[in-house]
C-alpha cells in the first residue's frame, strides 16, 4: 500500500514555469502540488494556508526578494523544507540560500529526475546540492567572505553594477531612487574594499558571478 504523498508548493513568478513543474511533479506517484505563488509576498501568505512538506522556489522574484521570502516562509511554516530551484549556477547564490535556511539548491538546467530526487531527499530530512554546485562550494573557503556581509538588496545592486548597469538604470529596475542606489553603492564599496565599478566587476568574476 503506497504511503502518504509529499505535499509540494511552487513559488516562481512565471506561470508557464510553474505549470511545467506542476506537470512534472504530479507525474510522480508519491507527490502532489498543493499550492502556488507568483511572488515572495504571496508565498508567505499561501504557505500558512496549505502547510506543504516541501517548498520548491526560485529566488529571483519581484517584491521582497527570494532570500527574505525564504526566511519568512520558514518562520511561518518551520516544518516545511525549502528546495531552491534557480537559474543562478554559481556557488555564491547557493551559499547565500543555504545560509538563509534552504535544505537544497538545484539549477534550472538540471534533469527532471534530479528535481524529483531532490524533493524526496529534502522531505526525508536530508539536503540536496547539485554536484556542480557542491564541487564549487567545496573548493571555496569555509570562512566568511566579504560578499557574505552584503544584504540581499546590496547583493542585487552589486551584481547589477558589476554587470555594467548605471545607477540610474538600477534605480529604475529596482524601483529605488538614484540616491538610495548611491548609498548602497557606497556601502558595497566600503564592505568589499573596492574603489570603483571595475574593481567590483573583478570581485564578481573571481566569485564566479560573472564570466570574463
How would you describe each model-predicted region?
Residues 166-199:
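Recognition helix of helix-turn-helix DNA-binding domains
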Residues 50-56:
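Active-site beta3 strand of CheY-like receiver
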Residues 12, 58, 86:
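Active-site residues of response regulator receiver
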Residues 39-42, 62-68, 89:
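Acidic catalytic/metal-coordinating carboxylates
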Residues 45, 67-79:
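Short amphipathic alpha-helix used as the core "switch/output" element in two-component signaling
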Residues 88-89, 179:
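Short, conserved "switch-loop" micro-motifs in signal-transduction and mechanochemical regulators
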Residues 92-99, 103-156, 198, 209-211:
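Short, flexible helix-to-coil linker/hinge segments that flank and couple to helix-turn-helix
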Residues 30-38, 46, 194:
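Short hydrophobic/Thr-rich beta-strand motif most characteristic of the beta2 strand and flanking loop
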